[in-house]
């Protein structure tokens, strides 16, 4: 059966190669956003994995928590020190732009996007790992719309050591790469850069360098996957066809029933 890919840029396809045959594992998703749409972890959860989801938007965190009872889902932000920060939450039609990064918000506002502001408690990745993670971490995903450096500055990558780290590496709604602000943190922690996929940069811990080969090749027909958004459209079209064909099916049944009644009446009259 083909793999169902939910991630925006097929990140889950590359990761599925790296962890082929694994029905259990542990992931950390900082900036989890949604339990299904563009989720880098949905495929793995469906296999039997579990993990830690961090989402600063209260409604989205609640949605993830309801959909993922095996997971730990926290409604907090992640930064380089604990405390409280202003979270800029975009309107629902652009929810993926929500961020703690003030400079990115100003650019988006100039382009016409609207945000509401909330004070949200923040902690560090190191503190989250110490409190909630008690097993090896297979992969970490960071998708925080311009706040990557602060997240990585608050990590302890010698103690909390995911095998693979995937970081969104372009500025929101731009092709400009942003890794110059934060990549040195990963390299100094003995992570090796593997590949840039046009949106994200992938890194492997040097002691797991054997996983790099599985990440290097772009998703392709050999991966045997179906993009979830395509499946949604297919299912919707099937439903439309079913709805449109209902009158035809009813008419056919009516004709069949009428013919049966007519035959019965003819036999009765003989």
Predicted regions and their residues:
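Phosphate/nucleotide-binding beta-alpha loop and adjacent structural elements of enzyme active sites
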Residues: 1-270
